[in-house]
Amino acid sequence: MTNDRVQDEIRHALGVRPQIDPATEIARRVEFLVDYVLTTGVRGLVLGISGGQDSTLAGRLCQLAVEDLRRRGAEAEFWAVRLPHHVQNDEADAQDALSFIAADHELAINIGAATDATAEQYEKATGEQITDFGKGNVKARMRMIAQFELAGEKKALVVGTDHAAEAVTGFFTKFGDGAADVIPLAGLNKRQGRELLRHLGAPDHLIVKVPTADLLDDEPGQTDESSLGLSYDQIDDFLEGKEIEPAAASALIEKYRRSEHKRRTPVAPTDTWWIRH
């Protein structure tokens, strides 16, 4: 199968539209959240806010959704949660994001002590120090534990920030930031997310902020693009069906194939999707 055909299949599988209307997409995704909250009978939404593009956008959509729900007579609230590991270097951006989102409730749960305790117990049990990469994944999973803890107490849903540019590369922690009840940004690539933020009136410095997972102690602020070896422009072009450098296209296709397990529920003996033909 040619790369062009695989590219088209991936784009369709992830639900990416080459062109979008920001106002329409915002309305569609807010309505999706409203409908799902009403269907599940929960009382609200919970989302971790980092100060990056994705959580800023998802957070504003969540607040718009619960306001819409209340206008319809439903009980619904939104909890925006800061989840720093000790001290976050870009805390000012996180606070700016919270101001823009204007959530019903803001709170902070510091995951530093819990993450460090897990690392200490791992070293005690194995005699080995956990790698920086491994600890980074623990941070992501600890954040999700905290969000589900809050959501369980508030009878709410956990909102994830996964979008097409992350999904195609598998650039998320399995059962960490990849774990959520609902993902309203699905099908959007990075540049489309920026379009929605501009339409919503987000601060410019949050819209153009260089994306970083910020999970590594040894390399704080390492950019997504550095980790991926690809630019988001290349990823977005690929997802929109545009031609990109053959080497970049092949790299993306391989990342997509290798990360398929992250986009699936746990594999069972009856599953066949994982078998390479």
Predicted regions and their residues:
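Short, structured secondary-structure boundary patches
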Residues: 58, 66-70, 127-132, 178-184, ...
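Predominant activation on well-ordered alpha-helical scaffold segments within soluble catalytic domains
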Residues: 59, 63, 95, 148, ...
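Long, well-ordered amphipathic alpha-helical subdomains in the mid-to-C-terminal portions
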Residues: 212-250, 257
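Intrinsic disorder and flexible/low-complexity segments
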Residues: 242-277
